[in-house]
């Protein structure tokens, strides 16, 4: 028999649309609940009945392997009826608008919608039209809250804290929803955030988000506790932002030489998918300081915690 959870945390929001708006207490509550699911997921019996009788729809307008499968596993382990909606075979391909889709889905009374969309703000717009809870699984270059939470959980489990750590976020910051959500979370939790990228991949006014800015890896990684690499998101680029992949790797790709600028016990992270030989070297990605595979494991636990925390707010929960 699965033991009862110790955490009674309830997310005081109907939806999880972003890290923005979450307090330090919210983040800590979700991370603490996630810790319990890490342990559960390492048992033979990984099931709980928290979402039994609930319907979870995964609605992905952008292709995703890790995030969609992670949410599917999370929902099924909690006992939900999980439906994956393929946009490529849906009415959206026939001209139906996002709002039409929202209204249609709402008529089916789903309890939780997990939504990924290529346009920033689209998930929030959809959330206004449905009665159930909505989780943002990534919207354009805006936010990806569960990725930031799983990154925070990975860091906290390895370093024991978030406060006071120096976190270097390196690469395509301009097009990265992961960077934005991580910056918001890490600042809220008292970490010191540094973004490292060529000028062409830095959003104008990024300093206003409370980060330090470095334009070369030696300066950016100096004294870093965490080195978080981002992939080049060419699908969001209109035009050339870097001369070539080879030149980009030479200056901004993480290899053993550049990693040596960070602290000796620095963690190497990457949200995936990785472009090996572009933003990160295979030796580093698979090396002793890498926690990239652990991030994937933490993703399932975090998404179970988010689903649980939102489900506790649902009617008749």
UniProtKB/Swiss-Prot annotation:
> Which key words tag this protein in UniProt?
Pyrimidine biosynthesis, Transferase
Q: Which gene encodes it?
A: pyrB
Sorted alphabetically, which SUPFAM superfamilies does this protein's record hold?
Aspartate/ornithine carbamoyltransferase
Q: Does the keyword rRNA-binding apply?
A: no
Associated pathway:
Pyrimidine metabolism; UMP biosynthesis via de novo pathway; (S)-dihydroorotate from bicarbonate: step 2/3
Q: How does it assemble?
A: Heterododecamer (2C3:3R2) of six catalytic PyrB chains organized as two trimers (C3), and six regulatory PyrI chains organized as three dimers (R2).
Residue positions binding L-aspartate:
94, 177, 231
Q: Which InterPro entries match?
A: Asp/Orn_carbamoyltranf_P-bd (IPR006132), Asp/Orn_carbamoylTrfase (IPR006130), Asp/Orn_carbamoylTrfase_sf (IPR036901), Asp_carbamoyltransf (IPR002082), Asp_carbamoyltransf_Asp/Orn-bd (IPR006131)
Q: What is this protein called in UniProt? A: Aspartate carbamoyltransferase catalytic subunit
Q: Indicate the enzyme's highest-level EC class.
A: transferase
The source's superkingdom equals Bacteria
């Amino acid at each position: 028999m699965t033991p009862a959870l110790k955490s009674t945390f309830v997310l005081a929001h109907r939806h999880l649309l972003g890290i923005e708006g979450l307090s330090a207490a919210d983040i800590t509550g979700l991370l603490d609940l996630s810790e319990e699911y890490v342990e559960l997921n390492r048992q033979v019996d990984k099931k709980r009945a928290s979402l039994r009788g609930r319907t979870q729809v995964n609605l992905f307008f952008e292709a995703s392997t890790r995030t969609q499968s992670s949410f599917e596993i999370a929902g099924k382990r909690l006992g939900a009826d999980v439906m994956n909606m393929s946009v490529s075979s849906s009415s959206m391909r026939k001209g139906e608008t996002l709002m039409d889709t929202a209204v249609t889905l709402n008529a089916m009374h789903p309890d939780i919608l997990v939504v990924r969309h290529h346009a920033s703000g689209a998930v929030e717009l959809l959330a206004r039209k449905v009665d159930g809870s909505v989780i943002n699984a990534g919207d354009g270059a805006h936010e990806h809250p569960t990725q930031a939470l799983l990154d925070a959980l990975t860091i906290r489990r390895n370093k024991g804290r978030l406060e006071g750590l120096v976190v270097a976020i390196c690469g395509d910051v301009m097009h990265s929803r992961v960077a934005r959500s991580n910056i918001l979370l890490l600042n809220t939790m008292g970490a010191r955030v540094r973004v490292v990228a060529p000028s062409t991949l830095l959003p104008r006014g990024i300093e206003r988000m409370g980060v330090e800015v470095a334009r070369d890896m030696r300066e950016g990684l100096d004294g870093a506790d965490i080195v978080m690499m981002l992939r080049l998101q060419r699908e969001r680029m209109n035009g050339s932002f870097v001369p070539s992949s080879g030149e980009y790797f030479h200056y901004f790709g993480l290899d053993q030489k550049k990693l040596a600028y960070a602290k000796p016990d620095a963690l190497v992270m990457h949200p995936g998918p990785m472009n090996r030989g572009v933003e990160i070297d295979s030796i580093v990605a698979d090396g002793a300081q890498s926690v990239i595979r652990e991030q994937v494991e933490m993703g399932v636990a975090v998404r179970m915690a988010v689903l649980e925390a939102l489900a506790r707010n649902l009617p008749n929960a």
